[in-house]
A protein has these predicted regions:
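Internal catalytic-core helix/loop-beta-alpha segment
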Residues: 113-168
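Active-site metal-binding loops of divalent metal-dependent hydrolases
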Residues: 9, 187, 237-239
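Conserved beta-strand termini and adjacent loop/short-helix elements that scaffold enzyme active sites
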Residues: 6, 67-69, 236
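Phosphate-coordination/substrate-recognition cap region in phosphate-metabolizing enzymes
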Residues: 30-118, 261
Length: 261
């Protein structure tokens, strides 16, 4: 199974829509995605995500399933250092890196700054539980920190290279027909889902990775042993469609100008 997360185009937050540049990004994105075989499209209920999706959906004559729980993870806190009242990330390094709970996959919601807003803990659990329900509809059942596919043909492949050192070529042809789903959503909630899939604390992901607008984050399920699966990131923040279309990469959401190479 392949999951493609799409961050919305450059946002006009005052209108919960896109800037003119954001619409150009969305059109270039549509040209890229419309070449794919997509099992299902899913989308956040927020306007900037729906507007981004609209270009692809129109090009393909498709509709998206709206998932209320994949909205942005914008549950506000009061930053103890900068005093801003805003999203629960973008903390200064000297503050968040000394908080041991920020490195705890099960405990980061209990850090003092996160506990300011009790919705953060329940919202995180809600996203994780609903994402597991979505995966279960495709046959992936959460078991502790990985997924199992009951009834699926078992495979036993111990490595990615053969005994002679050549790349392992005997990949199951069935993998070519496995579903690809596309989810139009937001930087923060993408990091929430990746936190759950990869068992990495949310603060490490959201402070460590920048996902440009209309970027693709591609995650595939690796099913090489028995009927067990673990999700692995193939690409994160990919914007080849913008570079190929000579559209500059937006720095929206970053404290540094995005590299244009």
């Amino acid at each position: 199974m392949r999951i493609v997360f799409v961050r919305h185009g450059e946002p006009d937050y005052s209108k919960d829509s896109l800037t003119e540049k954001g619409w150009r990004e969305a059109e270039l994105l549509a040209k890229r995605i419309s070449k794919w075989k997509v099992e299902e499209f899913y989308c956040s209920p927020l306007g900037r995500a729906k507007d981004t999706a609209s270009c692809t959906l129109k090009a393909m004559g498709r509709e998206a399933v709206i998932l209320p729980w994949i909205r942005e993870f914008s549950y506000h806190i009061d930053d103890p250092v900068t005093k801003r009242h805003s999203i629960p990330w973008d903390f200064v390094p000297s503050y968040w890196t000394k908080e041991s709970l920020m490195y705890d996959i099960d405990g980061w919601t209990q850090a003092d700054v996160m506990k300011q807003n009790p919705i953060i803990e329940s919202a995180y659990k809600d996203v994780c539980q609903n994402f597991d329900k979505l995966l279960a509809s495709y046959g992936y059942i959460r078991e502790n920190n990985f997924y199992r596919m009951p009834g699926k043909k078992e495979r036993f492949v111990a490595g990615t290279v053969s005994k002679d050192g050549s790349p392992f070529a005997d990949h199951d042809d069935d993998s070519l027909s496995e579903p690809t789903i596309v989810i139009f959503c937001h930087l923060g909630v993408i990091c929430v889902v990746l936190s759950h899939l990869l068992n990495i604390p949310f603060p490490l992901l959201v402070h460590g990775f920048f996902l440009p607008t209309t970027s693709l984050t591609i995650v595939s399920s690796e099913e090489h042993w028995s009927n067990e699966a673990y999700f692995r990131v193939q690409a994160i923040g990919d914007v080849h469609h913008l570079l190929n279309g000579k559209e500059p990469i937006s720095s929206a959401g970053s404290f540094v100008k995005a590299f244009q190479g």
